[in-house]
Regions:
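Phosphate/nucleotide-binding beta-alpha loop and adjacent structural elements of enzyme active sites
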Residues: 1-283
Length: 283
């Protein structure tokens, strides 16, 4: 049996202690300005040196999580500075979370967005967290289990343009930069095989009649996922809100042109992400 990537100790066993606890409390109180962030990052660095490879059991964005901040930039942010974790994007999502809201978190990592949406949206919301990297998926599933949120489902696969087994490129320095594309991965990226599905296949398997919002953090593969979906899916399945990682790659510019042609309008752009809404939703 393969070794689990989540420590089996009861939750709370790895609660922050000593210098690490002091640093964590301080970093979470740091403001969002330049000086506040510099201070938070300095204190975080000190805490990480003390912590070593051990995990942390914390509450982040309202959810209990076991985080491994040395392995993944997203987990480092969730542990020490959740106030910096895509705050404008989360606010945009929170405005829309009501009733039987359907949200897909694609490239869910350990559940930051998914668990935020689950807790904010209430028990009637339907949250699907999609994470392809097996070791990160284990941590995602663990965090969902700890949260007690029955409205979140985790799926271990990659989204791509065709159904079938695919190759993932895993950045050894940051598991959050895992991708089906070589773009952005380091030259010594580890390669693994994982199941792949199209977004339309996934939506049909889940029985979705609509998608209220989707977040994509898939390291340059956004066009591979969205273009065949827009081509083949019924209009009623087009997401009302799209939040995706923003890069300067030409493929992203092509995708933005495609989104505008389908009636999407840009409503938010941050240093890392861009968000679009369907114009018909604003009528």
């Amino acid at each position: 049996m393969p070794r689990s990537n989540v420590d089996a100790a009861p939750f709370g066993h790895y609660a922050p202690r000593g210098l690490c606890a002091l640093a964590l409390r301080a970093t979470r109180r740091c403001p969002t300005g330049w000086l506040g962030k510099r201070t938070a990052f300095f204190l975080r660095g000190l805490a990480l040196r003390v912590l070593g490879a051990r995990p942390l059991d914390v509450v982040s964005l309202g959810a209990p999580m076991r985080l491994y901040p040395q392995r993944n930039v997203a987990e480092k942010r969730l542990a020490f500075t959740p106030q910096y974790f895509d705050a404008p994007e989360r606010a945009l999502l929170a405005e829309r979370l009501k009733g039987e809201f359907v949200f897909l978190d694609v490239g869910a990592s350990v559940g930051g967005y998914a668990l935020f949406a689950a807790r904010f949206g209430g028990p009637r919301a339907r949250i699907l967290a999609v994470e392809p990297l097996p070791e990160v998926f284990e941590r995602l599933a663990y965090n969902i289990g700890q949260s007690g949120c029955a409205n979140v489902k985790a799926v271990g696969c990659a989204l791509i343009d065709v159904d079938g087994e695919i190759t993932l490129f895993v950045n050894p320095g940051n598991q959050g930069e895992t991708s089906v594309c070589i773009v952005g991965a380091e030259a010594n990226a580890r390669q693994i095989k994982v199941p792949g599905k199209t977004l339309l296949t996934l939506a049909r398997e889940e029985g979705y009649e609509r998608i209220d919002a989707i977040k994509l953090d898939i390291e340059g593969a956004e066009e591979l996922v969205l273009e065949p979906f827009f081509r083949d899916a019924p209009r009623t399945l087009r997401p009302r809100l799209i939040i995706m990682e923003f890069t300067l790659l030409p493929v992203v510019a092509t995708l933005e042109t495609r989104l505008r042609s389908l009636g999407y309008r840009e409503i938010l752009r941050t240093r890392e992400n861009v968000a679009y809404t369907l114009a018909e939703e604003e009528a």
